[in-house]
Amino acid sequence: MNTDYTPLVNVPIKREDIETCRFSNWYPLFKKHCPTAEIIGPLPAEFIEYLEQDGIKIPNENRSFYSEDLTINDDNEYSDWDNEDDDEEEDKVIQQEVKKEIDPLADFPELHRQIKDVITKYGAVAPKMNWSAPKDATWILPNNTMKCNEINEVYLLLNASNYIAHDLQHAFDECEDIEDQKKSSDFELVLRKWFDINPALEFRIFIKDNEILGISQRDLNYYDYLEPLVDKFRDLIEDFIDDEILDRFPLKSFVIDLYIPRPFNKVFLIDINPFARMTDPLMFSWSELLTKNEPVTPIGQEEDYEFRLIKENNVGRFACKEHSENQVPTDIVEASLNPEAIRELTQKWKELLSKQSMEEDSSSDSNEE
């Protein structure tokens, strides 16, 4: 049996291309088309270590939802009860671990103050780093969004996000200029003024050599009112890219995220991403985008690219929340904020395993009889 296989198409990318897509490099060019934001950087090394460490130490801020029930004992540990009766050996281990943790108030107080000032200025913010936003970590906040009303929510989101970890550790892994991969990079924290986005009205546009390869709905759920608006969206997107982006952005190949809110008379620039496999192709595949049989038509002329929308209600899709693969039980989240809770969770886990083992042994004995 003969089977045709589509060869994996290489997507060459250089470090310079990825750096060009850094928020601080394109935001000044298109500021009037973007949500209001402030950039803090370069970030101190202690802050990067803080985000990379296992677990996170939450500052005991006044009026903070995340520390109001915690008290500081003589060992400077956060706990909701005294540990006088705890095992001394375990206490010594925990104390050593706590001392190793980075404390924002002690290790980067100036950055801590800057973040608080921006939150006070805007009321609420949505954080991101050089390239990525912690969309995969919204499960850790009570509102299940990236809306941060206080500084501890910023810390929790960034620390829990795999996307942020990728920015810090693997941003240049796909670069073909291998030597440049080893160069260090300055990191920055972006705090966007919070505004509500209707996820149905955000679109991802793939551009290669200044030509549109395809447009994809950003949120992969079905919205029945989108399809009748496709022609309007297409015109707005093409005009915006042709008039505002192509002549000002230095790269010819990139991926851009745009938001078109009602009444559909303005386009917001949300993000610019590298034209590389690290960027999610959403309703396309990278091989599909790169192996089109016919050349695409320049922007402004009759289009021959696809504008892809979810065409029908997918019950299975709605049952699976976006980024659910990154979510964990709330017990684990709470335990990560408190060494005492970690001990309690571990003990419960051991008890469950012991109970399961006893039940299996009992079942085995019954079968033998």
Curated annotation (Swiss-Prot):
Mg(2+) binds at residues 271, 273. GO terms for cellular component: cytoplasm. One of its GO terms (molecular function) is magnesium ion binding. The keyword Plastid does not apply. Its main location: cytoplasm. The keyword Nucleotide-binding applies. It comes from the Eukaryota. ATP binds at residues 128, 131, 133, 135, 192-195, 202, 204, 218, 257, 271, 273. GO terms for biological process: eukaryotic translation initiation factor 2 complex assembly. It is found in: Cytoplasm. Keywords: ATP-binding, Chaperone, Cytoplasm, Magnesium, Metal-binding, Nucleotide-binding. Belongs to the CDC123 family. ATP-dependent protein-folding chaperone for the eIF2 complex. Binds to the gamma subunit of the eIF2 complex which allows the subunit to assemble with the alpha and beta subunits. This is Translation initiation factor eIF2 assembly protein. It comes from Vanderwaltozyma polyspora (strain ATCC 22028 / DSM 70294 / BCRC 21397 / CBS 2163 / NBRC 10782 / NRRL Y-8283 / UCD 57-17).
